[in-house]
From Swiss-Prot:
This is Encapsulin nanocompartment protein Rv1762c. It comes from Mycobacterium tuberculosis (strain ATCC 25618 / H37Rv). The keyword Membrane does not apply. Keywords: Encapsulin nanocompartment. It comes from the Bacteria.
Length: 262
């Protein structure tokens, strides 16, 4: 991902990062990352408010809505790129605990705000060792605990990767609706539409990982939203952390832990 230009307001805030850090890490995450050689630098974020355009689709058409797919992807990408720019300005090695949230903005449902937030960290033992080949900081949505486990296993995070697809699922005919009354029946247009949309979103996420030179994607999750488009138009969104192998790693033996609280 190419960084965007750094916002002047953010530049002023980041100029004080060396004095004291700000982080959304929990106490456990902070302690574990510190033990692994990482120290927090500053909370970094990126925002994009986007106007989502209109695309016509007939009621009986089963298809991806490319205009809406591009709009929601580009808005997320802008937010992520601005967060990346803040981390790179701090000369961070990575961004951990990345969260990418959205909300409706303003009165109309066609305005969406996406916000990316994470904690920029530095690898104190060897600054720059965990950056990407292009020199940018890595980004990961993994928790501090998962991050340390990943490193111990001989892998390192590369980038937060994502894919999406806005899909219109055709309205079934009147006779088909009549045949379903009182019966258990599969709804083929919904089944096929969901399959197509998920596959497109997954393939786009995998393409991002391959572009960044990763060997796999971990912590994958799905989200389904229809924003303000109605029940027959849905967006399938998938995201995860692309990883690369760094060594053989160590064998992590599970241990029994007995909680003392009741």
């Amino acid at each position: 991902m190419q960084s965007s230009s750094l916002d002047p307001v953010a530049s002023e805030r980041l100029s004080h990062a060396e004095k004291s850090f700000t982080s959304d890490l929990s106490i456990n995450e902070f302690a574990l990352l510190h033990g692994a050689g990482f120290e927090p630098i500053e909370l970094v974020m990126g925002v994009s408010v986007y106007h989502v355009g209109f695309q016509f689709s007939g009621m009986r058409q089963q298809q991806e809505l490319g205009v809406l797919t591009e709009a929601t992807y580009r808005a997320r990408w802008n937010a992520m790129a601005r967060m990346q720019a803040e981390a790179d300005a701090l000369k961070a090695d990575g961004i951990v605990g990345v969260r990418l949230n959205w909300r409706h903005h303003g009165e109309g449902g066609e305005h969406l705000e996406f916000m990316a937030v994470g904690t920029a960290v530095r690898y104190t033992a060897k600054p720059g060792a965990f950056r990407r080949p292009n020199g940018q900081a890595f980004s990961s949505h993994l928790s501090g605990q998962d991050m340390v486990t990943l490193l111990r296993s001989g892998f390192a995070p590369v980038a937060f990767v994502m894919g999406n697809c806005v899909f219109h699922i055709a309205v079934q005919g009147f006779m088909q609706t009549l045949r379903q009354i009182g019966r258990n029946m599969e709804m083929p247009q919904w089944t096929q539409g969901n399959y197509q949309a998920r596959e497109l979103a997954m393939s786009r996420m995998q393409s991002e990982a391959e572009r960044d030179g990763a060997t796999g994607v971990v912590g994958v999750h799905f989200a389904i939203s229809n924003y303000a488009w109605g029940v027959h138009t849905v967006e399938f969104y998938t995201a995860g952390t692309a990883v690369r192998r760094t060594g053989s790693g160590e064998t992590i033996t599970p241990s029994f832990v007995l909680p003392m609280d009741s």
